[in-house]
C-alpha cells in the first residue's frame, strides 16, 4: 500500500506516465469531456471532492511547467482563480478563452472530474521535468 502521494490508482498511473509537456485536466462536474480522452470520475456528489482538494493532491505529486485556465474564471470565479495563483506559484499561468480551453482538453492524457459545481473551476496542467 502506498504511504504518500496520490492513492487513486488511475491518477497515480497517469502521473507516472506523463512526459514533458503532456497535459492533464482537473475539471468541475460540468466540463464536457471529449470523446477519446480518458475520464477519471471522482465526483460522488455536488461539491465532493472539491476542485481545490484534488488540485492540491495532484500538484503535490506532479512536476508542473505551465497552467492553463479559462480567462472567464477571473471575473466569474475570482476565489478559485486566487487559490490557483496561491497554490501554483512556480509554474507560468496562461489564460485562454473558455472555447480555446475546451479545444485544448482534446489533447489531454486524462481529465479528472471532481464534484465542484462553481463556474470555470477547470485547469490544464502541463507536465514539466524534475531535473
Swiss-Prot record:
One GO-annotated biological process of the protein: D-ribose catabolic process
Free-text function comment from the UniProt entry: Catalyzes the interconversion of beta-pyran and beta-furan forms of D-ribose.
InterPro entries according to UniProt: D-ribose_pyranase (IPR023064), RbsD-like_sf (IPR023750), RbsD_FucU (IPR007721)
Highest taxon in the source lineage: Bacteria
Catalytic residues (UniProt): 20
Broad enzyme group: isomerase
Family assignment from sequence similarity: Belongs to the RbsD / FucU family. RbsD subfamily.
Record's protein name: D-ribose pyranase
EC number per UniProt: 5.4.99.62
Main localization category: cytoplasm
Keywords, in A-Z order: Carbohydrate metabolism, Cytoplasm, Isomerase
Keyword Transmembrane helix assigned: no
Subcellular localization(s) per the UniProt record: Cytoplasm
GO molecular function: D-ribose pyranase activity; intramolecular lyase activity; monosaccharide binding
GO cellular component: cytosol
Reaction catalyzed: beta-D-ribopyranose = beta-D-ribofuranose
Quaternary assembly: Homodecamer.
Pathway where it operates: Carbohydrate metabolism; D-ribose degradation; D-ribose 5-phosphate from beta-D-ribopyranose: step 1/2
One Pfam family here: RbsD_FucU
Binding residue positions for substrate: 28, 98, 120-122
Amino acid at each position: 500500500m502506498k504511504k504518500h502521494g496520490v492513492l487513486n490508482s488511475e491518477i497515480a498511473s497517469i502521473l507516472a506516465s506523463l512526459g514533458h509537456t503532456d497535459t492533464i485536466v482537473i475539471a468541475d462536474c460540468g466540463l464536457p469531456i471529449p470523446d477519446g480522452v480518458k475520464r477519471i470520475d471522482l465526483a460522488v456528489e455536488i461539491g465532493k471532492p472539491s476542485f481545490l482538494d484534488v488540485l492540491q493532491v495532484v500538484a503535490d505529486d506532479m512536476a508542473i511547467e505551465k497552467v492553463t485556465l479559462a480567462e472567464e474564471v477571473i471575473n466569474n470565479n475570482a476565489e478559485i482563480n486566487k487559490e490557483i495563483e496561491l497554490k501554483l506559484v512556480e509554474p507560468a499561468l496562461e489564460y485562454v478563452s473558455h472555447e480555446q480551453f475546451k479545444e485544448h482538453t482534446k489533447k489531454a492524457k486524462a481529465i479528472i472530474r471532481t464534484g465542484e459545481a462553481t463556474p470555470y473551476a477547470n485547469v490544464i496542467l502541463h507536465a514539466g521535468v524534475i531535473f
